[in-house]
C-alpha cells in the first residue's frame, strides 16, 4: 500500500483522521514520506510509484465513482485557487486548477494551495478571481479539485472512505499551531478556510465532475498522461 498525499492545508482533516485510523504500519510510514504537490503526485500515480492517493480530478477522470467516493470539494468559493493579474501563467504545482482556468476562459496567473491562501488573506481589496466561485456562478455546481483514486485494495479504501466520511474530525490546537507556523497564516484563517472544504462526492458533486470532464473534452484541454 503506497499512498501519496497532497501536502496542503485542505488535507489537514484527513491528516488528523488517518493518525488514529487502523492501517498497516508501513502505510503510515510511506504516507509520511510521500507528501507533495498535486501535479507531482499525479505523475507518481500515473507511473505507479504510488498505488493510491488524493490526486487531481483531471488525472482521475478514468476512475469509477461510487457512493462512498471521496474528493476535495469546494462549494461557491474555495479561497485557495485564484487567478490574479492579467498576465497568463499556470501554477506548476497544479493540474485541475490550470485546466479549470482554461475551461472558464480566464486570463491571469493561477495560484493554488498555501500561497493562494496567503495572497487571499493579505489582500483586502480582493482583486482576484476565486475559481470555485466563478464555476458555481456559471454551473450552479460544486467543483471537485481532487479525488481519492486507487489501483488496488478496493475494500480497504472503501472502509477508510466510509470511516472518514462519517467521522467529524476536530483538529487539535497543537496541529493548528504547527500549520500556522508552516504556512504563515493565522489559526483562525486556517479554520475559516477549512469551512469551505468538504470531502463527500454526492450527486451534485458527481454532476460537477462530469460537467468539468465535458468542458475538458469540448475545449480539447489535455489531461495528464503517462506518455
Could you say what each language-model-derived stretch is?
Residues 1-227:
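Domain-level signature for soluble enzymes in the chorismate/prephenate branch of the shikimate pathway
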Amino acid at each position: 500500500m503506497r499512498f501519496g498525499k497532497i501536502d496542503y492545508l485542505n488535507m489537514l482533516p484527513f491528516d488528523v483522521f488517518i493518525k488514529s485510523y487502523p492501517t498497516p504500519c508501513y502505510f503510515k510510514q510511506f504516507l509520511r514520506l510521500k507528501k507533495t504537490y498535486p501535479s507531482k503526485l499525479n505523475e507518481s500515480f500515473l507511473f505507479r510509484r504510488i498505488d493510491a492517493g488524493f490526486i487531481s480530478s483531471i488525472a482521475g477522470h478514468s476512475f469509477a465513482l461510487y457512493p462512498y467516493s471521496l474528493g476535495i470539494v469546494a462549494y461557491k468559493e474555495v479561497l485557495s485557487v485564484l487567478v490574479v493579474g492579467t498576465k497568463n501563467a499556470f501554477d506548476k504545482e497544479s493540474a485541475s486548477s490550470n485546466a479549470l482556468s482554461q475551461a472558464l476562459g480566464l486570463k491571469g496567473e493561477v495560484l493554488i494551495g498555501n500561497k493562494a491562501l496567503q495572497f487571499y488573506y493579505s489582500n483586502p481589496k480582493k482583486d482576484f478571481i476565486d475559481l470555485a466561485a466563478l464555476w458555481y456562478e456559471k454551473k450552479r455546481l460544486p467543483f471537485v479539485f481532487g479525488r481519492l483514486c486507487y489501483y488496488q485494495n478496493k475494500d480497504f479504501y472503501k472502509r477508510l472512505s466510509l470511516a472518514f466520511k462519517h467521522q467529524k474530525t476536530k483538529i487539535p490546537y497543537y496541529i493548528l499551531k504547527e500549520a500556522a507556523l508552516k504556512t504563515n497564516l493565522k489559526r483562525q484563517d486556517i479554520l475559516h478556510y477549512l469551512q469551505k472544504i468538504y470531502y463527500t462526492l454526492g450527486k451534485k458533486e458527481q454532476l460537477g465532475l462530469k460537467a468539468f470532464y465535458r468542458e475538458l473534452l469540448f475545449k480539447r484541454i489535455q489531461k495528464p498522461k503517462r506518455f
